[in-house]
Curated annotation (Swiss-Prot):
The gene is BIP4. It comes from the Eukaryota. This is Luminal-binding protein 4. Its main location: endoplasmic reticulum. It comes from Nicotiana tabacum (Common tobacco). It holds the Pfam family HSP70. GO terms for molecular function: ATP binding; ATP hydrolysis activity; ATP-dependent protein folding chaperone; heat shock protein binding; protein folding chaperone. A motif (Prevents secretion from ER) lies at residues 664-667. Residues 1-25 form the signal peptide. It is found in: Endoplasmic reticulum lumen. Residues 644-667 are annotated as: Disordered. GO terms for biological process: chaperone cofactor-dependent protein refolding; endoplasmic reticulum unfolded protein response; ERAD pathway; protein refolding. Keywords: ATP-binding, Endoplasmic reticulum, Glycoprotein, Nucleotide-binding, Signal.
Length: 667
């Protein structure tokens, strides 16, 4: 670099004047409450998602259209439609390249991130590089290939959760609290908010999952100060948090964890065990057979769940490969042996979180289990042993605790929480230290890790060179002392500083983290009042406004397409229901069997048989075709039925029976 350029532009040196470092806690946001409707709480999980709402003084966890209170975070594409949840997951074995799961591992990350590179090898669908970000490439229909951002796939899951809540509440929902792992950095939080926008949701708050779990737990624990350890071992991530609860006031003391440890890793170990076993017994390597792997993955998960309550399970899969049926036992002891190192690995973050909080084991009053994987007896035992025999608390359903807490927070924000939540004060924390680079590549920390947010800190810096007119502010997150070992979030220049001897100018740098953990940085030359600022967004691969708008539009088009598919299915079901209803009536002695002339019966039989054959040959006909066919069959059957009932003085059962049935979706 030329000498002159070096004089004008260099790093900063700490002048050491700390102006202020106030912490602000937040309670009920009344100004927000005035403009928010009902605010639902969504736990957007790596493997499963869950939605709740605060209603009539308590939280309701809402079941989906399959009757399940947790929904797989899976999306699948077939030639005719897009599936979300159970339907998508069930299709994985036969449709692996077009079934997308674990997208939370990609959201807010760069394509060359080592985690993304590692995960690419573990999923059957294709991940491609677009503008340095990982996008998912799938065939949607008629051989058409499309790429989706992780935000778009997450938005599809959020839409499913939103629709689940809307069906239960009987009204449109616009506002939500969405949870993220405590370890999510700013890019991942921003991307999660963007996913909400694409799904048509205003994400009123992003809160940490363990914090949400603590709220779920805290409602009935208002007496005195308690230290609580939240142990959250889900399908994809592991988080440990230590909180204090004092008369309804929550404070997070520390967080730790592992972004890649959870139930799926335990499933993977079971799969690897069986893949080796199959190779040994049958000489067949199924590790590249996506269809077989999909079937095996589903059974591995089922076996793991069963082993939490029984000591042995038989894994049975019909026609796993080459027409060979698979049947093998798996004991709890073998399962524990396969995962022993992973189970033990969970204790490291527990110890680190304890050290960060500055607490002894005896000072933990309650241990709260969150996430389905905490049902595993060995995990519970290791935790109990670590805390010298203290029993973990099981008063909260581990699958639902996070959504429950998010729903309570939603109740607070919407003002629907009432007396039960009015005393809750929620203090969240910054998951990683935030700072800037100063001379020598030093990471100068402005907001230490675990600082309560929202927060604002300012510090005055000065110039390193005489006559320096520009400074570059480089913003980093991380715990290391040199910026080369931390993560660059963004940078900007403050220009137009009046030339002066080194150490003279005063440049005030202000870091502000809002309640969602999103960072704004401002630098101001105190002499001239000139300032520059940055919200850490696009520099970190966040979607642009245009991209978000395009994705919102596409999401609406998908919704329109989904609506058309549903209308087509409804029309088909109406025809099928009418035909079967008619066939039942003409063969039932209590209904029409004895009242019809043989030629009348034959006419109806011919019309219904022909309709069923037409249905078999026209599986994917259009809605109008099904409606037209129904009219044709009705034109034959209804006059006969009406005449019969007029003769006998009854109601024309064929018509009313059929139309009544039309109002109900078939299971």
């Amino acid at each position: 670099m030329a000498g002159g350029a070096w004089n004008r532009r260099t790093s900063l040196i700490v002048f050491g004047i700390v102006l202020f470092g106030c912490l602000f806690a937040f309670s009920i946001a009344t100004e927000e409450a005035t403009k928010l409707g009902t605010v639902i709480g969504i736990d957007l999980g790596t493997t499963y998602s869950c939605v709740g709402v605060y209603k009539n003084g308590h939280v309701e966890i809402i079941a989906n259209d399959q009757g399940n209170r947790i929904t797989p975070s899976w999306v699948a594409f077939t030639d005719g439609e897009r599936l979300i949840g159970e339907a998508a997951k069930n299709l994985a074995a036969v449709n692996p390249e077009r079934t997308v799961f674990d997208v939370k591992r990609l959201i807010g990350r760069k394509f060359d991130d080592k985690e993304v590179q590692r995960d690419m090898k573990l999923v059957p669908y294709k991940i491609v590089n677009k503008d340095g970000k990982p996008y998912i490439q799938v065939k949607i229909k008629d051989g058409e290939t499309k790429i989706f951002s992780p935000e778009e796939i997450s938005a599809m899951i959020l839409t499913k959760m939103k629709e689940t809540a809307e069906a239960y509440l009987g009204k449109k929902i616009k506002d939500a609290v969405v949870t993220v792992p405590a370890y999510f950095n700013d890019a991942q939080r921003q991307a999660t908010k963007d996913a909400g926008v694409i799904a048509g949701l205003n994400v009123a708050r992003i809160i940490n999952e363990p914090t949400a779990a603590a709220i779920a737990y805290g409602l009935d624990k208002k007496g005195g100060e308690k230290n609580i350890l939240v142990f959250d071992l889900g399908g994809g991530t592991f988080d440990v948090s230590i909180l204090t609860i004092d008369n309804g006031v929550f404070e997070v003391l520390s967080t730790n964890g592992d972004t890649h440890l959870g139930g799926e890793d335990f499933d993977q170990r079971i799969m690897e065990y069986f893949i080796k076993l199959i190779k040994k017994k049958h000489g067949k390597d199924i590790s590249k057979d996506n269809r077989a792997l999909g079937k095996l993955r589903r059974e591995a998960e089922r076996a793991k769940r069963a082993l939490s309550s029984q000591h042995q399970v038989r894994v049975e899969i019909e026609s796993l490969f080459d027409g060979v049926d698979f049947s093998e036992p798996l004991t709890r002891a073998r399962f524990e042996e396969l995962n022993n190192d992973l189970f033990r690995k969970t204790m490291g973050p527990v110890k680190k979180a304890m050290d960060d909080a500055g607490l002894e084991k005896t000072q933990i009053d309650e241990i709260v289990l969150v996430g389905g994987s905490t049902r595993i007896p060995k995990v519970q035992q290791l935790l109990k042993d670590y805390f010298d025999g203290k029993e973990p608390n099981k008063g909260v359903n581990p699958d639902e605790a996070v959504a429950y807490g998010a729903a309570v927070q939603g109740g607070i924000l919407s003002g629907e929480g009432g007396d039960e939540t009015k005393d809750i004060l929620l203090l969240d924390v910054a998951p990683l230290t935030l700072g800037i680079e100063t001379v020598g590549g030093v990471m100068t920390k402005l907001i230490p890790r675990n600082t309560v947010i929202p927060t604002k800190k300012s510090q005055v810096f000065t110039t390193y060179q005489d006559q320096q007119t520009t400074v570059t502010i480089q913003v980093f997150e991380g715990e290391r002392s040199l910026t080369k070992d931390c993560r660059l979030l963004g940078k900007f220049d403050l220009t137009g500083i009046a030339p002066a001897p080194r150490g003279t100018p005063q440049i005030e740098v202000t870091f502000e983290v809002d309640a969602n953990g999103i960072l704004n940085v401002k630098a101001e030359d105190k002499a001239s009042g000139k300032s520059e600022k940055i919200t850490i967004t696009n520099d970190k691969g966040r979607l642009s406004q245009e991209e978000i708008e395009r994705m919102v539009k596409e999401a609406e088009e998908f919704a329109e397409e989904d609506k058309k598919v549903k209308e087509r299915i409804d029309a088909r079901n109406s025809l099928e229901t009418y035909v079967y209803n008619m066939r039942n009536q003409i063969n039932d002695k209590d209904k029409l069997a004895d009242k019809l002339e043989s030629d009348e019966k034959e006419k109806i039989e011919t019309a219904t048989k022909e309709a069923l054959e037409w249905l078999d040959d026209n599986q994917s006909a259009e809605k109008e075709d099904y409606e037209e066919k129904l009219k044709e069959v009705e034109a034959v059957c209804n006059p006969i039925i009406t005449a019969v009932y007029q003769k006998s003085g009854g109601a024309p059962g064929g018509e009313s029976g059929a139309s009544e049935d039309d109002d109900h979706d078939e299971l």
